[in-house]
Amino acid sequence: LLYYICHKFNIIETKKLHIVSFDVPFPADYGGVIDVFFKIKALHEAGVEIILHCYNYGRAIAPILEEFCIKVFYYKRNLSPYLLLLNTPFVVSSRNSQILLNRLAADNYPILFEGLHTCKILNDKLIEHKAKFVRTHNIEHDYYKSLSLAESKFSKRKYFSIEASKLEKFESVLTYAQGIAAISKNDNLYLNAKGYKSVHVSAFHSNNKIKCKTGNGNFVLYHGNLAVAENDIAAKFLLEKVFSKTNIPLIIAGNKPSKELISLVQKNKNVQLKHTISNEEIIELVKEAQINFLPTFQPTGIKLKLLSALFNGRFCMANSQMVANTGLEKYCIVEDDTELMVKNLENYFFKDFNEADFIFRQQIESSEFSNSYNCKKLIDLIF
């Protein structure tokens, strides 16, 4: 109400912001676009007027974005294979538009570039008069190195490896940004050590209130996009190293599982695979599970599925790479030794998630993982 009155009578100056997104951020159905969509929503609710620019490659135009933005523009991503021959990373050179550049240059509003992917024009002279900020979602060359190590196909492995080298060199473009909003504490430490002007602004997400159910569930859940090599490896690890040693039931939920994963599931009577499943159905499984088990072997950025599990689920188990330096360690059962993982499973599977557990988990609502907290931090950085 206070914002409305001030805005109506021009008591405060309207804040306007260009956001350049690497993809159309709706539906908010994977890590990167979840952060972008709920950031846009939070900024809109805080009174920031957003001019959104989206690179598009296979996702539909999203009219819902117009509810939160004063203008929305779409730009076709250039997927020409000739771009692979350039020194600029393909994920960057394929997101380049003169029309976008001209629109950005036409006013004095600040710009938030979403990810290193969108930074091809960061140092362009046409926008040197503008305040420019970058939201980093990963240390991209580390992320691509991890993808390369996790990939079994030679052609993809080679692509990720070459892209990682190019991204490491391209990263220096960040010197042209007035500020960087790093998604994780580890990324923030790295960027500041490199001399970039970075602050930690954690991931934006769909959760505002803890919605965990008390009582017991009757299965353990692992969820993730199974087409991503990192998640495929984590699911196989659980099957081969943990659930082969216990009869506790496991559900693996996620689309596009590999043939190898399907074969492994068929060998384990206590494991079920749900692979034609919507986000809404996954959230229901997160809520119903007794334990959400989320290991990772790629400690980059912050895993939004961990936040989802903590806001919506009962007990959460993870390895140290999933939670290291996140501030979420105290809310999880953290273990790296597989024998102790099995012991913890058999202990917590029969425990009540009680009122005291629920109240303890509620601390997250008012922490650095709340959207309102991070929105204020971002506004302070940009304006």
Describe the predicted segments one by one.
Residues 2-70, 106-107, 244:
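N-terminal subdomain of nucleotide-sugar transferases
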Residues 35, 203-264, 273-283, 287:
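Conserved catalytic-core segment of nucleotide-activated headgroup transferases in glycan assembly
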Residues 95-98, 350-383:
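A charged, aromatic-enriched C-terminal amphipathic alpha-helix characteristic of glycosyltransferases
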Residues 99-105, 139-143, 151-180:
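Membrane-proximal helix-turn-helix segments that form the acceptor-binding/catalytic region
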Residues 128-150:
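Active-site proximal beta-strand in glycosyltransferases
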Residues 160-210:
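Donor nucleotide-sugar binding/catalytic pocket of nucleotide-sugar-dependent glycosyltransferases
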Residues 286-301, 312-314:
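Acidic donor-binding loop of glycosyltransferase active sites
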Residues 305-311, 315-319:
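Short hydrophobic beta-strand element within catalytic cores of glycosyltransferases
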